Curated annotation (Swiss-Prot):
Organism name: Geobacillus thermodenitrificans (strain NG80-2)
Subcellular location: Cytoplasm
Residues annotated as the enzyme's active site: 107, 351
Major localisation: cytoplasm
Record gene name: rlmN
Something else known: Reaction proceeds by a ping-pong mechanism involving intermediate methylation of a conserved cysteine residue.
GO BP field: rRNA base methylation; tRNA methylation
SS bond partners: 120-351
Residues annotated as domain Radical SAM core: 113-346
Protein name: Probable dual-specificity RNA methyltransferase RlmN
Length: 364
């Protein structure tokens, strides 16, 4: 049994830490300061220390009065994540397995592109959606992450990039968990990382993906955010989608498409449909024709995903020539489509794989 598993089984490290200051929006921090007799402008100074200088100790915030630094230290923590495993791929992709205060672990991935560095963040410890092709759902949902724990992932990766004077240029919320199942923390996270005084990641450089929790799609559309939005679709018909994604029983495909149309009409923004290709399951030309019919007339983009092999699942990769044929079939119908570039194929880069491997080690 590893130290992580031992802590969870014995109760060690189970004491709740102080609330993470990373969980506070700038307005919430201003409110806290005013309530404690301080000027609201101090919030901007604190944000600069947290997200500009990325300090991890309130004592280092030297332009704040000592009394305020002490008050902050007694009221909040600055979340730091312990790196358990760090895997680096030949293509530069880096996968981190971070340990949380209670011993649970989460994954965060840094992906290198010719246009910058993208971070894929996790929103939950585990997942309850139950997609039959995904390693994230193995073991079920353990708990939601606090907004500060999601923010801390980006900060941690940015600190690693500081060593080479690089920066995080985009964020994808596509790691372990269903973001809309942890909606309030997600929205707070988005507001913090997008804020010009926070991590200052432009809204159009942030993408949120959902498996299709329909009420939250309507709510997200009404938020008025310019965040990129993606649907994990993976099947063009109700029957096939239900086999791949049990959530389709609760939120069936026709209703999902109604919600997508509402989102497009409300925001004027394009929706991306993620479509993982599984050999012999959803990758035939008839599936491409069905998908084109489903998406006809929509302001959308299809992202075809060559799937990573997951040992605990039985799906196999679609051959490259078949992926290209699928792409051509969609283009023939005027569908905007790309094939996702593979990242970290030589490491445990599929969502949840590294954490699943760690869980196996813990049970030995």
């Amino acid at each position: 049994m590893t130290n992580t598993a031992a802590r969870r089984s014995t109760g060690e490290a189970q004491l709740l830490p102080l609330p993470s200051i990373y969980s506070l929006t700038l307005d919430e921090l201003k409110e806290w300061l005013v309530a404690h007799g301080e000027k609201p402008f101090r919030a901007t100074q604190i944000y600069e220390w947290l997200y500009g200088k990325r300090v991890t100790d309130f004592a280092e915030m030297t332009n704040l009065p000592k009394r305020l630094r002490e008050q902050l230290a007694s009221a909040f923590s600055i979340t730091t994540l312990k790196t358990i495993v760090k895997q680096t791929s030949k293509d530069g992709t880096i996968k981190f397995l971070f340990e949380l205060h209670d011993g649970y672990s989460i994954e965060t991935v840094l992906m290198r592109h010719n246009y910058g560095n993208s971070v894929c963040v996790t929103t939950q410890v585990g997942c309850r959606i139950g997609c039959t092709f995904c390693a994230s759902t193995l073991g079920g949902l353990k708990r939601h992450l606090e907004a500060g724990e999601i923010v801390a992932q980006v900060v941690q990766v940015q600190k690693a990039l500081d060593e080479t004077e690089e920066r995080v240029s985009s964020i994808v919320v596509m790691g372990i968990g269903e973001p809309f199942d942890n909606y309030d923390a997600l929205i707070k996270f988005l507001r913090i990382v997008n804020h010009s005084k926070g991590l200052n990641i432009g809204a159009r450089h942030i993408t949120v993906s959902t498996s299709g929790i329909i009420p939250k799609i309507y709510q997200f559309a009404d938020e008025g955010m310019q965040i990129n939005f993606a649907i994990s679709l993976h099947a063009p018909t109700t029957e096939l989608r239900t086999k791949l994604m049990p959530i389709n029983k609760a939120y069936p495909l026709p209703k999902l498409m109604e919600a997508v149309r509402y989102y497009i009409e409300k925001t004027g923004r394009r929706v991306t449909f993620e479509y993982g290709l599984f050999g012999g399951v959803n990758d035939q030309l008839e599936h491409a024709e069905q998908l084109a019919e489903l998406l006809k007339g929509l302001k959308c983009h299809v992202n075809l995903i060559p799937v990573n092999y997951v040992p605990e699942r039985n799906y196999v990769r679609t051959p490259r020539n078949q992926i290209f044929a699928f792409e051509r079939a969609l283009k023939k119908h005027g569908i905007n489509v790309t094939i996702r570039r593979e990242h970290g194929h030589d490491i445990d880069a599929a969502c949840g794989q590294l954490r699943a491997k760690e869980r196996k080690e813990e049970t030995r």
